[in-house]
Amino acid sequence: MNLNGNGNVNIALVSLTDQGLATARRIGKSLPGAVVQEFYIHEKALCSNNNHREGQSDPQHQLQVFQHLADIIPRLWQQHSVLIFVMATGIVVRQIASLLEGKDRDPAVLVLDEQGKFIIPLLSGHLGGANIWANQLACQIGAQAVITTATDVRGLVAPDEYARRYGWKVEPLNHLPTVNRLLLEQGCLNIWTSYSLKPDEAWVNDEHYQFLSDKDKEKANVIISSFPDLTIKDDLIYLVPPILSVGVGCRRGVSVEAVIEGVTLAIEQLGASLKSLSGIYSIDLKSDEVGLIEAAKYLRIPFQTFPGVELQAVIEREQLNRSKFVKEKIGVDGVCEAASLLGTQRGQLILPKFKGRGVTVAISLENSLSWASGPETLNI
């Protein structure tokens, strides 16, 4: 299951009433236990001994009891990629209104009535995967998905839906409504990619997208590139693949601000987008470095470390920069360049060691794109 294109699907289920609890159980049973990480029920719905006993004996999900939605939703919002509420839509709207950040950052939000007759993908229908979750859960529990997104209603696949399938980002987001409106009005979008690889059959055979040659690039409404020009016409968006890996070396106790600053300056030197980052990579001696961990959280990318012996092997094989100071401190000739290369599958170093405030940064480019789309259905 990979609805968000990144493999990090985790769900929280929240219900208010006795009947809502029964519906929530049906949903929970239709999903793999690993993805439903939290299961909440209002304390009043557990007033009967039967409900309480059933909740404690559920082999898949341990019920957690709450008194007020406002006490749990802010944390769930930050920690889960999918939130499923079994309650009135108005209640959910009022609870989440102050938490909204943007369609590229908000979780998928679905709302069901307590009898499980209707499923509404309320928020993040495309980039968050709420629409496909609604459709597939409707099939599983015998409900009706209520989809209101214009492109979906007309049977069109919007560019941000393709972005979700591949785990790509959209820039600039404020151009997306204009481009989607063009798709609705014209029935077709022009697309150009700076990469030589061809996309998967589903996209190639989508009659609503016309792939352009280099000479017709200026006619594009969608460009696939990790190096977007954001001074662009409002009927153009970039789909940004995460193909730049950032290697970071640092002094102990470096601040998160210094790490973010160093990474940002390095990306700016390349004319790339922060959304093109696949992760922050370093040596395993830095696996507990708070500045690196928090910077990765802020940028919403993985943080991964490698053993020093692996870094040294890359340094020697690729003839990378060597530092006597680093060698004396941690036993390897360098960190950032080798770590950035190890963060790719078949990459090349495109920005050698760059020095910031207490950090060194290097960037490698993945030489191949993965066009394997996410599944159209849930494996449940």
Indicate where each model-derived feature is located:
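Short, basic, helix/turn surface patches
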Residues: 138-140, 171-180, 327-341
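Short, structured active-site "lid" loops
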Residues: 61-90, 296-303
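Extreme N-terminal starter segment of soluble prokaryotic enzymes
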Residues: 7-13
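General small-molecule cofactor/ligand-binding pocket signal
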Residues: 37, 146, 209-212, 302-306, ...
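Conserved mixed alpha/beta catalytic, RNA-binding, or beta-rich assembly cores of soluble enzyme
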Residues: 16-33, 46, 66-68, 78, ...
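N-terminal beta-loop-helix "entrance" segment that forms/cooperates
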Residues: 35-75, 289-290, 314-320
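C-terminal non-catalytic interaction/assembly regions of soluble proteins
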Residues: 276-277, 281-340, 344-351, 355-359, ...
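Charge-patterned, long linear interaction tracts outside catalytic cores
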Residues: 358-380
